[in-house]
Amino acid sequence: MTLAQFAMTFWHDLAAPILAGIITAAIVGWWRNRK
């Protein structure tokens, strides 16, 4: 595994949950403000 492949794998493993958390928080915040 090259350094670039390691960096890409690490980025995807790190970025995917963070992005999902931000999207979830945004939807929950919007839903609560809507009620």
UniProtKB/Swiss-Prot annotation:
InterPro entries: Toxin_Ldr. Induction: Expression of the proteinaceous toxin is probably controlled by an antisense sRNA, in this case rdlB. Only a few of these TA systems have been mechanistically characterized; the mechanisms used to control expression of the toxin gene are not necessarily the same. The keyword Transcription does not apply. Keywords: Cell inner membrane, Cell membrane, Membrane, Toxin-antitoxin system, Transmembrane, Transmembrane helix. The keyword Repeat does not apply. One of its GO terms (cellular component) is plasma membrane. The chain crosses the membrane at residues 10-30. It is a single-pass membrane protein. It is found in: Cell inner membrane. It comes from the Bacteria. Toxic component of a type I toxin-antitoxin (TA) system. Overexpression causes rapid cell killing, probably by disrupting the cell inner membrane and disruption of ATP synthesis. Belongs to the Ldr toxic peptide family. This is Small toxic polypeptide LdrB.
